UniProtKB/Swiss-Prot annotation:
PANTHER family: 50S RIBOSOMAL PROTEIN L36, CHLOROPLASTIC, LARGE RIBOSOMAL SUBUNIT PROTEIN BL36C. One of its GO terms (cellular component) is ribonucleoprotein complex. This is Large ribosomal subunit protein bL36. It comes from Prochlorococcus marinus (strain MIT 9313). The lineage of its organism: Bacteria, Bacillati, Cyanobacteriota, Cyanophyceae, Synechococcales. The gene is rpmJ. The keyword Ribosomal protein applies.
Amino acid sequence: MKVRASVKKMCDKCRVIRRHGRVMVICSTPKHKQRQG
């Protein structure tokens, strides 16, 4: 899980979602998981 100020899709499988007011990226590649901090 990467925590960064700007979350972006890193590949075609990445999905940008909102959970509990946080912007997150979920992906089948574990390396691509991000959340906004």
